[in-house]
UniProtKB/Swiss-Prot annotation:
Listed Basic and acidic residues bias regions: 178-192
Residues annotated for GTP binding in this entry: 217-222, 353-356, 395-397
EC number: 3.6.5.-
Spans annotated as G1: 214-221
Tissue: Highly expressed in brain. Moderately expressed in spleen and lung. Weakly expressed in heart, liver and kidney. Expression during the cell-cycle progression is constant.
Catalytic activity: GTP + H2O = GDP + phosphate + H(+)
Annotated function: GTPase component of the eRF1-eRF3-GTP ternary complex, a ternary complex that mediates translation termination in response to the termination codons UAA, UAG and UGA. GSPT2/ERF3B mediates ETF1/ERF1 delivery to stop codons: The eRF1-eRF3-GTP complex binds to a stop codon in the ribosomal A-site. GTP hydrolysis by GSPT2/ERF3B induces a conformational change that leads to its dissociation, permitting ETF1/ERF1 to accommodate fully in the A-site.
Lineage: Eukaryota, Metazoa, Chordata, Craniata, Vertebrata
Region (G5): 395-397
Chain spans, region G4: 353-356
Name listed for the protein in its UniProt record: Eukaryotic peptide chain release factor GTP-binding subunit ERF3B
Length: 632
C-alpha cells in the first residue's frame, strides 16, 4: 500500500495502514512534517476511540465465564458456508447492517456503519466494516477459546447441508432457524437408534436354554459347533480357519468344537472346562446353547450350567467301547443325567452321536442297543420314557440328522434335531411371579454388571431391586439380553444387568436379585429330604459335604438325622436313625457355613432342589422341606 513519500517511516498502529486509503492521505509535498505527523496522530486517535466505543458497547466484562453444555445443540459458526446467522436486533437495522447487502466496489475503504462486500476468495473476517460485523464476531465464542477448531469438526449431517450450498458465503442469511432445528433433531434420532431395543408390538420368540451334557469326548462341543454353522451363526470362512489351525496341531476332527471351546487350554487338550455359550434361532424359538464340560473334574461347572437350563441334550457316543466306558459306574453319563434332573431339567433329548464311525456305520442294531441300556437308568433317575425322553441318531462331525434328514438312516423316521427343538411345546412362564434372578457371575464394566437367568417375574430398566442375602438396595441401569440392549425382560432369559448402588466385591455367585415387596428367604439351617446316591460308608450327624443349590455353592454339615423314609410307601420312621447308607431316603437337618438364599421346594422348586457332593462324587440329591429360623 502506498504511504506517500515518507516510505521509510513505520505506521504508528495496526489500524493506520488500513485506514489510509490511496489518495485519501496528504501527499506530503508542501506540508510540514510536524503538521503531517500531528494530523496522522489525531486521525489514529479518533479511530482508536471509535473502535474502543464499539467494543465497549458489545462486550460485557462482567459476564459469567463460559460453561459448556453437553446436551446443547452443536455450535455452527456464522462464517462457515451455509450456516445460520444470529438474528438481528430489529428489522430496520438488519436492512442497513446485514452483511452481503448492496455495498461499495471491492477495494474502496468504507466508514464505520457502511456495509462491506466479502472477498471472492473466501469469507472476509476483519475488525473493519459495518458495526454488524463486530456484532457477529463478538456474539460467537472467542477464537482463543478454541471454538473455531471445534466448529470445523462438524458432524456429517451439517457438512452435507454446507456442501449442498457451495455458493453461500459470509453474507448469506443461511438456512432458517427451523431447518437447523430439524437437522439437530435428525442427528439426535440417529444417536438414539444405536441402542438395540425390541419394539413392543413385535412378536418375541420364546427363549429356551439348552444344556449339552454327557461323558467326556462324546461330541458335545462338536455338535454345538455344527449347529452354529448350520444356523448361520458361524460362517464357512471362520470354520476353514479353525480347520487349518486344528490340522497344524494334529487335531483335524476338533475344529467344529472350537466354535464353543474358545479357551486356548480347552483347544490344546480337547476338553471343555468352562460352560460355553452360544446362540441360535429357529422360526419359533431363540435358543442358548450351554456346553457343559464332560470331565469328572469339572462337574461343579456342569451343575452351574444345568441349573440355568430348560431342557438337556444327553450326548452319547455310539462308537464301540466309548458308550460302555461312559455308561459304566465311573463314567459321567449316569451322573450328568441325574444332576440334570436334580437341577430341574424336565425334558431330555438323547443324541446317539458318532453313528458315522466305522465301528457303527449307521447300524440300527447299535442304536437300539444303546437305547435299551439307557431307558431303565433314565427312568430310575426320574424321567418318564414316554413323555420326557426322546432318542435320535446323528453325526456331529458330518452334520447328518442335525438340521436335515439323513439318507444314511432311513430306519429313523422322526424329525432331525433342530426342527424337533422348534416343534417342542412352549414353556409356561408367568411374568406375574416374584422376581428371582440367581447370580451366576459378576464383573466391572462402567459400574457393576451381574449375569444370570431370570427364573421368575419380569425386570424393567430403572426398577428398584434388592440383592439378597445382603439386602442391598440397587437400581437397574441397563439390561442386555443375548448381546442386545432392552428395557424389559421376561422369565427364562439370560441377562446381563448393570446395577447402581452396589460394588462388584459385595456380590457372590448364588446371591439373588428380588423385588423389595417380595424378598426371597435366606438362612443357614433348614430341613431336607435327601436320597443317598453313592457312598461307600455310612453317613452320621457331623458329616460335611459341598452343597450345590441353584447357582450357590456352600459348605454344609448334616447336624441331625430326623427320620428314614420308606421308598415305596413314603412313610416316615418313628425313631431317629443313627446313620444312613447308600440308596436310603431320609429327612435331615443341614447347616451351612454361611448365610445362603433358598426357598422350599413346595414354594419355588428351582431354588429348593440341591445336590450334595464330596471327594469329586455326587453323594446325595434332595429338596428343601422347611426353613429353620436362627436362634438369637
Amino acid at each position: 500500500m502506498d504511504l506517500g513519500s515518507s516510505s521509510d517511516s513505520a505506521p504508528d498502529c495496526w489500524d493506520q495502514v488500513d485506514m489510509e486509503a490511496p489518495g485519501s492521505a496528504p501527499s506530503g509535498d508542501g506540508i510540514a512534517p510536524a503538521a503531517m505527523a500531528a494530523a496522522e496522530a489525531a486521525e489514529a486517535e479518533a479511530q482508536r476511540k471509535h473502535l474502543s466505543l464499539a467494543f465497549s458497547s458489545q462486550l460485557n466484562i462482567h459476564a459469567k465465564p463460559f460453561v459448556p453444555s453437553v446436551s446443547a445443540a452443536e455450535f455452527v459458526p456464522s462464517f462457515l458456508p451455509g450456516s445460520a446467522q444470529p438474528p438481528a436486533p430489529t428489522a430496520s437495522s438488519c436492512d442497513e447492517t446485514c452483511i452481503g447487502g448492496a455495498g461499495e466496489p471491492e477495494g474502496k475503504r468504507m466508514e464505520w456503519g457502511a456495509p462491506v462486500e466479502p472477498s471472492k476468495d473466501g469469507p472476509l473476517v476483519s475488525w473493519e466494516g459495518s458495526s454488524s460485523v463486530v456484532t457477529m464476531e463478538l456474539s460467537e465464542p472467542v477464537v482463543e477459546n478454541g471454538e473455531v477448531e471445534m466448529a470445523l469438526e462438524e458432524s456429517w449431517e451439517l457438512k452435507e447441508v454446507s456442501e449442498a450450498k457451495p455458493e453461500a458465503s459470509l453474507g448469506d442469511a443461511g438456512p432458517p432457524e427451523e431447518s437447523v432445528k430439524e437437522v439437530m433433531e435428525e442427528k439426535e434420532e440417529v444417536r438414539k437408534s444405536k441402542s438395540v431395543s425390541i419394539p413392543s408390538g413385535a412378536p418375541k420368540k420364546e427363549h429356551v436354554n439348552v444344556v449339552f451334557i454327557g461323558h467326556v469326548d462324546a461330541g458335545k462341543s462338536t455338535i454345538g459347533g455344527q449347529i452354529m454353522f448350520l444356523t448361520g451363526m458361524v460362517d464357512r470362512r471362520t470354520l476353514e480357519k479353525y480347520e487349518r489351525e486344528a490340522k497344524e496341531k494334529n487335531r483335524e476332527t476338533w475344529y467344529l468344537s472350537w466354535a464353543l471351546d474358545t479357551n486356548q487350554e480347552e483347544r490344546d487338550k480337547g476338553k471343555t472346562v468352562e460352560v460355553g455359550r452360544a446362540y441360535f434361532e429357529t422360526e419359533k424359538k431363540h435358543f442358548t446353547i450351554l456346553d457343559a464340560p464332560g470331565h469328572k473334574s469339572f462337574v461343579p461347572n456342569m451343575i452351574g450350567g444345568a441349573s440355568q437350563a430348560d431342557l438337556a441334550v444327553l450326548v452319547i457316543s455310539a462308537r464301540k467301547g466309548e458308550f460302555e466306558t461312559g455308561f459304566e459306574k465311573g463314567g459321567q453319563t449316569r451322573e450328568h443325567a441325574m444332576l440334570a434332573k436334580t437341577a430341574g431339567v424336565k425334558y431330555l433329548i438323547v443324541l446317539i452321536n458318532k453313528m458315522d464311525d466305522p465301528t457303527v456305520d449307521w447300524s440300527s442294531e447299535r442304536y437300539e442297543e444303546c437305547k435299551e441300556k439307557l431307558v431303565p437308568f433314565l427312568k430310575k433317575v426320574g424321567f418318564s420314557p414316554k413323555k420326557d425322553i426322546h432318542f435320535m441318531p446323528c453325526s456331529g462331525l458330518t452334520g447328518a440328522n442335525i438340521k436335515e434328514q439323513s439318507d444314511f438312516c432311513p430306519w429313523y423316521t422322526g424329525l432331525p434335531f433342530i426342527p424337533y427343538l422348534d416343534s417342542l411345546p412352549n414353556f409356561n412362564r408367568s411374568i406375574d411371579g416374584p422376581i428371582r434372578l440367581p447370580i451366576v457371575d459378576k464383573y466391572k464394566d462402567m459400574g457393576t454388571v451381574v449375569l444370570g437367568k431370570l427364573e421368575s417375574g419380569s425386570i424393567f430398566k430403572g426398577q428398584q431391586l434388592v440383592m439378597m442375602p445382603n439386602k442391598h438396595s440397587v437400581e437397574v441401569l441397563g439390561i442386555v439380553s443375548d448381546d442386545a440392549e432392552t428395557d424389559f425382560v421376561a422369565p427364562g432369559e439370560n441377562l446381563k444387568i448393570r446395577l447402581k448402588g452396589i460394588e462388584e466385591e459385595e456380590i457372590l455367585p448364588g446371591f439373588i436379585l428380588c423385588e423389595p415387596s417380595n424378598l426371597c428367604h435366606s438362612g443357614r439351617t433348614f430341613d431336607v429330604q435327601i436320597v443317598i446316591i453313592e457312598h461307600k460308608s455310612i453317613i452320621c450327624p457331623g458329616y460335611n459335604a459341598v452343597l450345590h443349590i441353584h447357582t450357590c455353592i456352600e459348605e454344609v454339615e448334616i447336624t441331625a438325622l430326623i427320620s428314614l423314609v420308606d421308598k415305596k410307601s413314603g412313610e416316615k420312621s418313628k425313631t431317629r436313625p443313627r446313620f444312613v447308607k447308600q440308596d436310603q431316603v431320609c429327612i435331615a437337618r443341614l447347616r451351612t457355613a454361611g448365610t445362603i438364599c433358598l426357598e422350599t421346594f413346595k414354594d419355588f422348586p428351582q431354588m429348593g432342589r440341591f445336590t450334595l457332593r464330596d471327594e469329586g462324587k455326587t453323594i446325595a440329591i434332595g429338596k428343601v422341606l422347611k426353613l429353620v429360623p436362627e436362634k438369637d
